[in-house]
């Protein structure tokens, strides 16, 4: 199987095999991974199926009965080893990430810092899985609640944040005593494999962490959802696929964490600090080329400041440098593939047809390939696709509003509820809006919710899914509560 050279200090990180039960396995059947910036072939990766996935699940189940009995302090030490190795190799993994995903190297390094925070956090949380003792109304009885690991877990991760989604899902599971089968996105398997390689080096016993790759995820997904040995699935991706996984998992009653699509509103009130709001929107909207589930998708600006704010924002957008993620000057890389380009074009075409104005951008970039111009649309209305559908690209549509009540209604007029953002200096308004907006996460006077790392819970409501990752709540989805009742205590 072919694999290209990437300038790494630790060349052992670039692996095009899968880890199953402590053994690195290849396959005669492979698929190709390309660099979205250049179109160059990076590697040929094993195209595995049901047989290999079943073997990985069996290995994880066998390992679970040993790993779950390892003292929490020892699991913590192994997680700390993993943390240390990922920190030492973060720059190399960032290069792999940029090569296969496209985002600027500086952004990839930022993602690595975010990914690392979850390993560090849950290495400590492993030692803090506490139960409870409850008073019993009956004399000579005692009641207790224990927390135990849920069992074998599957992590199905996306291409847009291929490092962070591995650690955000696996670190709390490992801390709890769970074992894993990981299925990374077919566009970005090398980043995930590198992290798994370092986990193996850190001392995780064989079978505790397994990874399977495939060009056609349906076969692996069907095995994961139907196999009774899998007790929990954590998935980040589209709402459409999340529904399929949930339906397929119903017969085996699996525990699910689903972080799905978003259509985030970004609101700028007339009392806001406009410069802060512009910078917040720039960071949130064009990070990863808009290819983030929490990316601002609908931008509402109060009518009194609308023209001023749009003008300020367009000035900043024109400063973005589109290019290969490995180029030092690039501040925005390519989209992941042609399908992503076509969706952005469709949303722009629909908006312009219905009366929107292109303030800047609006077409594929002169670099060609998967590159697209950062685009700003004004005079957008709620009848346009970009105001109701997730674009997942570098498109910023501006909508005018009059009152607070009106914009809250606009913000909540969607089936999704992952992230939202607003800027205001009025403390009373801040409380009202924060409580009224229907989303799992709210950024207040900031355009980046997730840059706080593992400290804050991450997850949505409505059709954006359920479950929380990160923070002290993040380990709960990997635990079951067992009630103990003691009698005849004299």
Go through the PLM ranges and name each one.
Residues 40-129, 140:
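Glycine-rich loop-to-alpha-helix module at the N-terminal edge of alpha/beta enzyme cores
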Residues 41-48, 63-69, 155, 266-269, ...:
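Short, well-ordered beta-strand elements within core beta-sheets of diverse protein domains
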Residues 131-276, 401:
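Rossmann-like NAD(P) dinucleotide-binding subdomain of oxidoreductase/dehydrogenase enzymes
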Residues 1-38:
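Hydrophobic face of amphipathic alpha-helices that form TPR/SEL1-like repeat modules
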Residues 64, 68, 83-90, 94, ...:
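Structural signal for hydrophobic packing residues in well-ordered secondary-structure cores
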Residues 39, 75, 97, 119, ...:
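Residue-level signal for inorganic ion chemistry
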Residues 240-381, 444:
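ALDH superfamily catalytic-core signature
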Residues 38-44, 230, 267, 321, ...:
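Conserved C-terminal structural/oligomerization subdomain of aldehyde/semialdehyde dehydrogenase
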């Amino acid at each position: 199987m072919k694999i290209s050279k990437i300038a790494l200090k630790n060349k052992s990180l670039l692996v095009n095999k899968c880890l199953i039960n402590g053994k690195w396995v290849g396959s005669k059947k492979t698929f190709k991974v390309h660099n979205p910036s250049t179109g160059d072939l990076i590697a040929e990766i094993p195209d595995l199926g049901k047989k290999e996935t079943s073997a990985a699940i069996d290995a994880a189940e066998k390992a679970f009965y040993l790993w779950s009995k390892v003292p929490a302090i020892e699991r913590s030490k192994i997680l700390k080893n993993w943390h240390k190795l990922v920190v030492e190799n973060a720059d190399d993994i960032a290069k792999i990430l940029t090569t296969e995903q496209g985002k600027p190297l500086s952004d990839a390094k930022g993602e690595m810092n975010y990914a690392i925070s979850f390993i560090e956090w849950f290495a400590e949380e492993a030692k803090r899985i506490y139960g409870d003792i409850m008073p019993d109304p009956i004399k000579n009885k005692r009641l207790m609640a224990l927390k135990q690991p849920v069992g074998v877990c599957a992590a199905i991760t996306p291409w847009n944040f291929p490092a962070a989604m591995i650690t955000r899902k696996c670190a709390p599971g490992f801390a709890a005593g769970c074992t894993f089968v990981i299925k990374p996105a077919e566009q970005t398997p090398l980043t995930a494999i590198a992290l798994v390689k370092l986990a193996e080096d850190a001392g995780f016993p064989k079978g505790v962490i397994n990874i399977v790759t495939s060009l056609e995820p349906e076969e692996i997904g069907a095995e994961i959802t139907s196999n009774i040995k899998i007790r929990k699935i954590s998935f980040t991706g589209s709402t459409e696929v999340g529904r399929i996984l949930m339906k397929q998992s119903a017969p085996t009653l699996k525990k699910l964490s689903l972080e799905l699509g978003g259509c985030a509103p970004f609101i700028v009130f007339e009392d806001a600090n406009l410069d802060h709001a512009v910078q917040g929107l720039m960071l949130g909207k064009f990070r990863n080329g808009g290819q983030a589930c929490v990316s601002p998708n609908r931008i509402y600006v109060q009518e009194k400041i609308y023209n001023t704010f749009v003008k300020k924002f367009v000035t900043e957008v024109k400063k973005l440098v589109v290019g290969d993620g490995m180029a030092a000057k690039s501040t925005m890389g390519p989209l992941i593939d042609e399908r992503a380009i076509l969706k952005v074009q469709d949303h722009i075409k629909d908006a312009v047809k219905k009366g929107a104005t292109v303030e800047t951008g609006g077409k594929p970039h002169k670099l060609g390939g998967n590159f697209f111009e950062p685009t700003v649309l004004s005079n957008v209305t709620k009848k346009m696709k970009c105001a109701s559908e997730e674009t997942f690209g570098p498109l910023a549509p501006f909508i005018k509003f009059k009152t607070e009540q009106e914009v809250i209604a606009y913000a909540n007029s969607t089936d999704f509820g992952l992230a939202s953002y607003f800027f205001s200096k009025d403390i009373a308004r801040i409380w009202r809006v924060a409580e009224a907006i229907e989303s799992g996460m709210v950024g207040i006077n900031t355009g980046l919710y997730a840059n706080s790392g593992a400290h804050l819970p991450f997850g949505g409501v409505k059709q954006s899914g359920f479950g929380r990752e990160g923070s002290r709540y993040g380990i709960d989805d990997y635990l079951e509560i067992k009630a103990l009742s003691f009698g005849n205590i004299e």
